[in-house]
Amino acid sequence: QRVILISPMIGVTSFARFSGVAGWPSFLPAFAKAAWLTIMPEFNPFKFNSFPTNAARQSFLLTSALQTQIAADSRNKKLDQLPPIMTFQSAMDSTVSARAVITALYNRLPVNHSEVVLFDLNHAVRFNALLRRSSYTALSRLLPTPPRRYDTTIITNVTAGSTEMEIRTIPAGKTEQIVEKMGLRYLPDVYSL
């Protein structure tokens, strides 16, 4: 038995807390578009481009309640009853917080063979116009120093200049990583998985 999570909404940016304020003018007919944080053509079948302000506010309220519940369950040892969790998360996800997945969930889990799989940025191609300089070191700031109570797998470039990908795994309770070639390459126009 295992729980599989794909880019779980454990946390969102703190800006979402105030997104309801951005929608206030929408009560006036001339400002109806203010009910949306962004309005764009829906060209991406895997992600909504337009996003209503109320959805951002509700996402913040939901994740705040979820984090409170996880913390309480951790203190009361209820998380010990969970089966192992396996999470797939992009380090560059701009919709949900990768940091919250680690700090609010994984760092509270007991030792139970849980694993987080993180997809790193494609370091072989520089997307300077799209990304902040800090994006290239985001993953190193995301994880606590090993040993950890959960397995950590990172899918990244073999070297910063290579599009060849590898898997770097640090098992729970260990500090040494195991490196394995994937036999795959990042596409030149992909900055993250």
Region spans (language model):
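Short, proline-centered helix/strand-breaking motifs
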Residues: P8, V21-A22, P52, P84
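Serine-hydrolase catalytic core
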Residues: K47-L193
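Short, well-ordered alpha-helical segments in soluble proteins
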Residues: S7, A35, T63-Q67
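A structural motif
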Residues: P25-T38
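Flexible glycine/proline-enriched surface loops and loop-helix/loop-strand junctions
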Residues: L37-P45
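Surface-exposed loop and adjacent secondary-structure segments within mature catalytic domains
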Residues: R17, V21-F27
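Active-site nucleophile loop of the alpha/beta-hydrolase fold
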Residues: I4-R17, L121
